[in-house]
Amino acid sequence: MSNDVYFESIHMQSNYEEFETQAQERENISKISTSLSKFRKMSPKSTRSFKVKSAPLTNRKARNRIKSINAHVSAQYKVSNGQQNDDILDFFLKRKHNISSILEGVEDLENRNIVSNDTPQPSDNTGNYSSQLFTQEEWFQILRRIKLRFPKLSARTRKSLKYVTTKLEHLKNINSDDDSPQLWTQAASLPEEGLVNEDMKWLYELDDEQMDIGSSFCNVDEDSDQKLFVLTLSQAMGEREKSEPDVEIISDSSPEPTQLLNDGIIEEEHEVDEEEEDNENEEKSEKQLASSPTQISSDDTQEQLTNRAEISSYEASSLFPNTLETQKQPVKSTIQKQASVVVPDYPKISNVKDEEIILSSSPTRDNEIFQTPRKYSVESVRSSPSSRSGRLGRLMVSPLKLLSPDRLDASQSVYSTARSSPTKQKRVRGREVNEKIVRKRFKTSRVEVAGNFHLKASDDLKIVSTVDKVNGSEVEDSEDDDHSVSIIEITHEVNDEELKAVDEEVTGEAEDGPSIIQVPSSPGNENLQEDLTSMQTSIASVTQEVPSNYTATQMRQALRSLDFPPERSKEGMASSLTRAASIAGTSVSSLLTPDAPYEEVKNQIYSAISESVKKDQLWHERVLSYEPIVLEEFKQWLGELDKDLKFDVTFLQQYCDHMGITTTIGTTTGTTAGTNTTTTD
């Protein structure tokens, strides 16, 4: 054994020496290589440029780019070599019903265009006619609006637009036989007839050079007789110039009525006119309107004035004396003409110039205040004189004040643009009469009577015997029992003198024991005494008794459900259930049923304790300041306050945990809960 160990040790020693020798040689070689690397860095850099051979490029197939997607699609799916439509439809994921509907619509459209147009339409190489999306006039309008909307375009784009315009004019000259007006022509020709150069210059903010060339482009040399401008919506709704008047004008010796102006001119009038003067003005207006009937000869006036709420009844009427002619006001901020307005002739109040006059409003009553313009217009048409078989109804209800035309501002007109700021119309309110509502006042008295009570019948008094109140504070009335307790409620009407005496009695000048007087809607309600519920708890607890047919097990189960501490005697359990029933306003029998609402009863007990705490300032401040409440003191204070609130420390601890009140258990050095106390844990 020893020889083997010796041999192994010698072998290990030789291996170790050999390993040390190899490690020393490697260290020497690394030192030599490190010293030689310094000379390697000092070698000069070569100035020869080496050419890197690139890999040979493979011959790629040149793919022809698709010049037109339409040509590509037509080349892929056109019918050739007797190919059927079913083969084409199968290519579209077997959705034959969708493709069939599309093809039928395209074929119907092409056939309809070919039949409707007399002149041959341009066709492609395949002979298929193409449908015309826009007419020539529509293309002209599109190009003009592009130039106005984008005045700073590139030279290439501007040249393209000019080329398209030239082609369209050439086609227009060729097809000049077609005189049917298109939609764009009708829409564009309406506002262009009534505009002048100053209006165009103001509308598009053009300079003299742009006005000379007739476009917003500075270097456009195309000749065009038509104007290259577009109007706003409010100006497009203006009336077109006509050579003949649309309405019949009757001239008489009566003074010219004042023009009906914008809504912003109407102001609210003070209530200074008497009722007699209003009635006289109404009678004069009705006589004057009925004496000179006039028929409106055109329907355009009615269509153009449908948006005017204040004259909606006049435009539909056929019994008005005279009309107003169309007037054009060359104001810079309002580029339109006033529409024809039919106004009845009313006499002026004063002959002085620029005096304010009063015109009648629409025949809508003051109490008919509509929320939407749709309803307002419908009701105005229904109430107009024309809807009453030609009979003129009563018009003026509330006067409106209008200013004279000389006082008008430039920004106030019938049609306003974006630069004007019209004000809203103010409606004149009628006379309001303050009527005092007469209310009767009653006095209610509740009297507690012990024993048999007899009262003579009387017409002035109403005797009500309270039975089974919800709150449980009032018990059943048993007049046959001499030792029972009754509560009688007496209600009768009182006058002001009696009410004053009642207020003095409630404030504390007179105290009549348990009698409580309640006067609804009187100023003394805030100083009433405590509610009848808190005063009758002791009476209810005395009268309620536990029926004898219930066992102690049932009562113990009810106490356990209410989290009450267990009682040893049956009388103690009955007393606890009686106190809980009196506070919750229910009977003891209802607490002993299987489906009794124990959670609701427990919440009512918690509410009764909370109300008692809120009425005492000291205990309420302790709770609000998070001062730890000593449970023994709290129990003693509740027992002295009301015998129905006698609970043990365990139940009060559950109440405090439920309400989030801090508590502690310790001894006190004070005598009562109202003094300063110290607690020791």
From Swiss-Prot:
GO terms for biological process: DNA recombination; DNA repair; DNA replication. It holds the Pfam family Slx4. GO terms for cellular component: Slx1-Slx4 complex. Residues 239-305, 505-528 are annotated as: Disordered. It is found in: Nucleus. One of its GO terms (molecular function) is 5'-flap endonuclease activity. Residues 265-281 have a biased composition (Acidic residues). Phosphorylated in response to DNA damage. Residues 251-261, 288-305, 518-528 have a biased composition (Polar residues). Keywords: DNA damage, DNA recombination, DNA repair, Nucleus, Phosphoprotein. InterPro entries: Slx4_ascomycetes, Structure-sp_endonuc_su_Slx4. Belongs to the SLX4 family. Regulatory subunit of the SLX1-SLX4 structure-specific endonuclease that resolves DNA secondary structures generated during DNA repair and recombination. Has endonuclease activity towards branched DNA substrates, introducing single-strand cuts in duplex DNA close to junctions with ss-DNA. Forms a heterodimer with SLX1. This is Structure-specific endonuclease subunit SLX4. It comes from Meyerozyma guilliermondii (strain ATCC 6260 / CBS 566 / DSM 6381 / JCM 1539 / NBRC 10279 / NRRL Y-324) (Yeast).
